[in-house]
A protein has these predicted regions:
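Core alpha/beta nucleotide-donor-binding catalytic domains of modification enzymes
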Residues: 2-186
């Protein structure tokens, strides 16, 4: 989506300026959306190639895994994404000779996600610590975009596309990012 695409471009800028070490891009195909999911993976591959990031891609049949675990697909998908991110981080750190303790999993969570998370926990119910806000850093997971709105990030990507000489990738329809229709309700 636009959040992850903006994060990729931001990490590229930080990598180019030497402010961060090696960066890779990960895409997890949950096998829930047929050809759209395949097109998402291809867009991510092209984005990683354009930004000269190593690309990690995996496929997980989240619906089947969720049924086996007696879990909802969204929670199972989250677990699978973080498991894949840990594996990608291990691989990148080993390949780049960077101590794993220095590696980070960087996610594109935004201010919008923070609000959505609060309301979801309110509806579902939660324990005493459940209303804590998303953390900027939790172990090796970093969320640098928590103060940015989705609208901010879309404006950033659109602005980048208008910048002469900027590296920008378009999907097969000419869009600056891919939209997951299953997220339209949030």
């Amino acid at each position: 989506g636009s959040d992850s695409t903006a994060l990729a471009y931001t990490m590229h800028e930080l990598r180019q300026s030497g402010d961060v070490g090696p960066v890779a891009l990960l895409h997890v195909n949950h096998k829930l959306r047929g050809q759209d999911a395949e097109d998402d993976a291809e867009f991510c591959r092209q984005l990683a190639e354009a930004l000269t990031f190593p690309f990690f891609c995996c496929e997980v049949d989240v619906a089947t895994e969720a049924a086996l675990a007696h879990e909802n697909a969204e929670a199972q998908g989250r677990r699978e994404r973080y498991a894949a991110a840990r594996e990608a981080l291990d691989s990148l750190c080993m390949h780049e000779a960077v101590p794993l303790a220095e590696g980070r999993i960087v996610t594109a969570h935004t201010a919008d996600d923070r609000v959505e998370n609060f309301y979801m926990r309110s509806i579902v119910g939660t324990g005493p610590g459940g209303f804590r806000s998303m953390l900027y850093r939790n172990g090796n997971v970093v969320r640098p975009l928590l103060d940015c709105t989705r609208s901010d990030l879309r404006s950033f990507v659109r602005g980048l596309a208008e910048t002469e000489g900027a590296t920008v990738v378009l999907d097969e329809r000419g869009n600056l990012w891919r939209e997951d229709a299953t997220n339209a309700h949030t």
